[in-house]
Each structure stands twice: as structure tokens, then as C-alpha cells.
Amino acid sequence: MTAPDPIRAAFEEARATLDAFLADPKNVDAVHRFARAAADTLKRGGLLMSCGNGGSMCDAMHFAEEFTGRFRKDRAALPAIAFSDPSQLTCIANDFGFDEVFARSVEAYGKKGDLLVAITTSGNSPNILRAIEVAKKKGITVVGLLGKGGGKAKELVDVPIVVPRAETSDRIQELHIKVLHIAIEAVERELFPGNYGES
């Protein structure tokens, strides 16, 4: 009997997670709402902000750089920032505590009509919950990229996008980056239709 191939099994598990996500129409609708909120924010001259811990911070940075740089084709730079500056984060953590590292940044940069993408695989990261709290007080729309049922964040954000089925952060993050890329493409298609052969 041939032993199971763990590498193939990992790909199969990733596919099963995506299939579970697509099986619920509410999930695709939430990504539409995310893309619409981001496009509307940019049309108003607002700022896209993002934050996360560990691998989710990498996703937050990836999201922002696709706007300030480009996604697929050259176009005007768009205002987006990930709260990932080491000196800023360590200053805030040292002086105010780690739970405040993103909240202080939202307080500093965010204004009514902006958008915050809050990324947490558990939905319960205290510093993400604090950032959401501050954002809501300022009239900032919050999209949550979440996992494991959505945690506390699910009830706090305007647009919760919860990865189903997955038990581990890596599987959750794999779907988060798909959601981010697809939302970015949707925003580009609206703001720069010529880049996609659309009028």
C-alpha cells in the first residue's frame, strides 16, 4: 500500500478550503462589498489602510503595495498604507503597549470615509480589535479578513470575510491573499478599465 503523499494532501486541503468558501454565496458577495468599498474610498480621495500580525502583516503590506505600485499594468499610484513601520510599531508598543500598535496608527492617519482592512486569522487579536474600535469611532469602514469562525471581530467589522473549514493559519492566509488579489483586480477594473480592455 502506497503511503499518502503529504504534499498532494496539502494541495487538496487548500482546494477544499476554496471550494467551501465558494459554496456559500455570502462569501463572494462579501468580496464584492469589499471591492466596492475600496473603489468608493479611492474615488472620494480617501485612504486605504491595512494591518495584521505576522503573516497577516505580510498580507497587509502586500495589499498596500499593489495600490501604491501596480497590480498588473502601469497606472497612477493610489493611496494605501500598511501599518508596518518597525520604529513606529516598537515606539507605540514600548510607550502604550502592544495592543495599541495599530489603533494609534488608525488614530493618526485615518479619517471619516477611509477604509481599514483588518486581518486576523483568529478574529481575536487584541491589537486588531483595538484598531477596529478606533476606526469605527472615526467613521472608517472596516473590512475584516478572518478565520476560525470570525472571532470577536466578525461582529465589529462592516464587511466580515471569514475563511470556512480551515483549522490552521496557513490555510486561512492562503485564502486571504486570494481575496485581496481579487478585490484589487476588481478595483482596478473599475478605476482603470482601459487596462483590462474595457471601456
Language-model segments: residues:
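Generic N-terminal amphipathic, Lys/Arg-enriched alpha-helix
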Residues: M1-K26
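Glycine-rich, small/polar surface segments that engage phosphate groups of diverse ligands
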Residues: R36-G110
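Glycine-centered short loops/turns at secondary-structure junctions
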Residues: G45-G46, G113, G139-I140
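Short glycine/serine/threonine-rich phosphate/pyrophosphate-binding segments
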Residues: S56-M61, N124-A131, A153
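Short, well-ordered beta-strand core segments
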Residues: L116, V142, P160-I161
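Surface-exposed amphipathic alpha-helices with a cationic face
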Residues: I132-K136
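Short, glycine/polar-rich helix-capping loops at beta-to-alpha or helix-loop-helix junctions
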Residues: L145-V157
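A charged, well-structured terminal subsegment
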Residues: S169-S199
